[in-house]
Amino acid sequence: MAITQFRLFKVCTCLATVFSFLKRLICRSGRGRKLSGDQITLPTTVDYSSVPKQTDVEEWTSWDEDAPTSVKIEGGNGNVATQQNSLEQLEPDYFKDMTPTIRKTQKIVIKKREPLNFGVPDGSTGFSSRLAATQDMPFIHQSSELGDLDTWQENSNAWEEEEDAAWQAEEVLRQQKIADREKRAAEQQRKKMEKEAQRLMKKEQNKIGVKLS
C-alpha cells in the first residue's frame, strides 16, 4: 500500500512539472507576438511647411549704414566753450572747506645789547663789565592797593607768625580731641557703674524675696 502511494506521488509530481513547463512556453510565445504587433513605423519624409520661417538676417557690416556720419554744432566753438565754463562755475566746490590755511608764524628777534664803553678821565676808553652802570631808566611800579614800592617794608617775621598760628590751631584741635575722648570714656564708665548698681540691687531684692518665702 505504501509503495503504490509513493508511485502515485511521483507520477503527480512529474505531471505537474510538465504542465508548468508547457505553461511557461505558452506565456513566452504570447509576449513575443504582442511585442511584434506593437512596433511603430516612423515616417521617412519631413514636412517643411510646419517649420516657422526665419526673419531675414542682416550682415553686421550694414548696421551703421543709417547712422549719421557727421555732427554739426551750432554756434561755433566759442559758444560751446563759454557754455562749458558757465557749467563749471555753477558746480559747487565741495572741497573748499577742506583746503588748509597756511599762516606764517611771527618771529621775534632779540638783539644783543652792545656793551657801553665809558671814558676814563685820562682820555682812554675802558672795558665793559657786567657790574658797570647802564643808562636804562629805572622802572617804578605804583599800585593803589599795595602803595609805593619805596614805602613798603618787608616783614621778615611773617612766615614765623604764620607757622605759630598754624601750630596753635593744631594744638587746639588736638586738645579738643583729647577732651572729647576723655568725656566719652567717663560717660561709658558712668553707664557701666549704673548697670552694675542695678544688677546688685536686683540680687539684693531676690535674696530678700527668698528669705521672706
From Swiss-Prot:
Conditions for induction? By 17-beta-estradiol (E2).
A Gene Ontology biological process in which this protein takes part is: T cell mediated cytotoxicity
| Membrane association type | Single-pass type III membrane protein
Phosphotyrosine occurs at 94
Q: Does the keyword Membrane apply?
A: yes
Region named Disordered: 179-213
User: What are the alphabetically sorted keywords of the record?
Assistant: Apoptosis, Coiled coil, Golgi apparatus, Membrane, Phosphoprotein, Signal-anchor, Transmembrane, Transmembrane helix
* Location(s), subcellular: Golgi apparatus membrane
Q: What is its main location?
A: Golgi
Q: Which residues lie on this side of the membrane: Cytoplasmic?
A: 28-213
Record-annotated membrane-spanning stretches: 8-27
Q: In which tissues is it expressed?
A: Widely expressed. Expressed in heart, brain, spleen, liver, kidney and testis.
Can you quote the domain comment? The coiled coil domain is necessary for the homodimerization.
Under PANTHER family, the record lists: RECEPTOR-BINDING CANCER ANTIGEN EXPRESSED ON SISO CELLS, RECEPTOR-BINDING CANCER ANTIGEN EXPRESSED ON SISO CELLS CANCER ASSOCIATED SURFACE ANTIGEN RCAS1 ESTROGEN RECEPTOR-BINDING FRAGMENT- ASSOCIATED GENE 9 PROTEIN
Subunit text:
Homodimer.
Per the entry, what this protein does is: May participate in suppression of cell proliferation and induces apoptotic cell death through activation of interleukin-1-beta converting enzyme (ICE)-like proteases.
Official protein name in the record? Receptor-binding cancer antigen expressed on SiSo cells
